[in-house]
Amino acid sequence: MSSKLRLGVAGPVGSGKTALVEALCRRLRDDLQLAVVTNDIYTQEDAQFLTRAGALDPERIRGVETGGCPHTAIREDCSINRAAVAELEAQFPELDLVLVESGGDNLAASFSPELVDLCIYVIDVAAGDKIPRKGGPGITRSDLLVINKIDLAPQVGADLALMEQDTRRMRGDRPWCFTNLHSGEGLEQVLAFLSQQLPNS
């Protein structure tokens, strides 16, 4: 692993990837040197959102337009993302953490080990309590699974106890957590996971 940590954030459209990246930037930017690469198919929407939200200085945020399958841009041919990361690392050699947010994708999405050191996979309760048991690399092999939007469970009829049971069965000893990123609930668990992974932490 390099002296800086490259962290991938993946998950389906609308699961809360950008919300997680924003929350991590806000909590960590005073203590760590950060940069972000976002992926969108035809726009730079997520990069623009993070800039407007003031998550980081604009020069530390790069938006990548993949122009096609978001999975390909982080796995099979991640050269456009590698170039964006390399550009940020050259501009800011003191970086501690580079966050790479994938475009919204399905449960089969996974990052190339050439691009990131670790991956957080984000799903949301609103997609249904069956999602953890459907499996896929994001569910079973990500370094941390984040189950977001737990506040919506009553509205969508999702059973959090069942999601917990299925998650434990599918992931074994791999870490996971419930979050409500809108309120910040569960964010401390994500931060604790990261603090264990950062070099020199």
From Swiss-Prot:
MF (Gene Ontology): GTP binding; GTPase activity; nickel cation binding
Domain of life: Bacteria
A single cellular component GO annotation: cytoplasm
Keywords for this protein: Chaperone, Cytoplasm, GTP-binding, Nickel insertion, Nucleotide-binding
GO biological process: urea catabolic process
Annotated InterPro entries: CobW/HypB/UreG_nucleotide-bd (IPR003495), P-loop_NTPase (IPR027417), UreG (IPR004400)
TM regions (residue ranges): none
Subcellular location: Cytoplasm
Sequence positions that bind GTP: G11, P12, V13, G14, S15, G16, K17, T18
Function: Facilitates the functional incorporation of the urease nickel metallocenter. This process requires GTP hydrolysis, probably effectuated by UreG.
Stored NCBIfam families: ureG (TIGR00101)
Subunit structure: Homodimer. UreD, UreF and UreG form a complex that acts as a GTP-hydrolysis-dependent molecular chaperone, activating the urease apoprotein by helping to assemble the nickel containing metallocenter of UreC. The UreE protein probably delivers the nickel.
UniProt xrefs under PANTHER family: UREASE ACCESSORY PROTEIN G
Family: Belongs to the SIMIBI class G3E GTPase family. UreG subfamily.
Stated name of the protein: Urease accessory protein UreG
Record organism: Synechococcus sp. (strain CC9605)
